[in-house]
Amino acid sequence: MARKRGSSSRKQKKVGFDYGVVHIKSTFNNTIITLTDKDGNTLTWASGGTVGFEGTRKGTPYAAQLAADKVAREALRMGIKKVDILVKGPGPGREPAIRTLQGAGLEINQIKDVTPIPFNGCRPKKRRRV
């Protein structure tokens, strides 16, 4: 029988930051939101799957909203008040995640789009015909 894990003490030690970076990776299938310190060390994260959605519902704007709310609450609990936001990807969860972070009481310093764009790199997949 599997043993139930206790809560990690690692999160408790990280308290004391006042500034963080929120990375939002939004694809058509899911939205992953990660809170890091300025050096890039992960403090907490959430996604459409961790807030209780499965399958295609993970990619919805509502799932991104709930994931952003979870990250924002954890950030405020750690004492983080100011954040930079780095957004990557074309998914539908980009805007709701940013709005939720702003509405949760985090002060947003800057919002950057860091979606990777190839300078004519690999040949893309053939176009889908329906």
Swiss-Prot record:
<keyword id="KW-0694">RNA-binding</keyword>
<dbReference type="GO" id="GO:0003735">
    <property type="term" value="F:structural constituent of ribosome"/>
</dbReference>
<keyword id="KW-0689">Ribosomal protein</keyword>
<comment type="subunit">
    <text>Part of the 30S ribosomal subunit. Interacts with proteins S7 and S18. Binds to IF-3.</text>
</comment>
<dbReference type="GO" id="GO:0019843">
    <property type="term" value="F:rRNA binding"/>
</dbReference>
<dbReference type="GO" id="GO:0005840">
    <property type="term" value="C:ribosome"/>
</dbReference>
<dbReference type="InterPro" id="IPR018102">
    <property type="entry name" value="Ribosomal_uS11_CS"/>
</dbReference>
<dbReference type="GO" id="GO:0006412">
    <property type="term" value="P:translation"/>
</dbReference>
<comment type="similarity">
    <text>Belongs to the universal ribosomal protein uS11 family.</text>
</comment>
<dbReference type="InterPro" id="IPR001971">
    <property type="entry name" value="Ribosomal_uS11"/>
</dbReference>
<comment type="function">
    <text>Located on the platform of the 30S subunit, it bridges several disparate RNA helices of the 16S rRNA. Forms part of the Shine-Dalgarno cleft in the 70S ribosome.</text>
</comment>
<keyword id="KW-0699">rRNA-binding</keyword>
<dbReference type="InterPro" id="IPR036967">
    <property type="entry name" value="Ribosomal_uS11_sf"/>
</dbReference>
<protein>
    <recommendedName>
        <fullName>Small ribosomal subunit protein uS11</fullName>
    </recommendedName>
</protein>
<dbReference type="Pfam" id="PF00411">
    <property type="entry name" value="Ribosomal_S11"/>
</dbReference>
<keyword id="KW-0687">Ribonucleoprotein</keyword>
<dbReference type="InterPro" id="IPR019981">
    <property type="entry name" value="Ribosomal_uS11_bac-type"/>
</dbReference>
<dbReference type="GO" id="GO:1990904">
    <property type="term" value="C:ribonucleoprotein complex"/>
</dbReference>
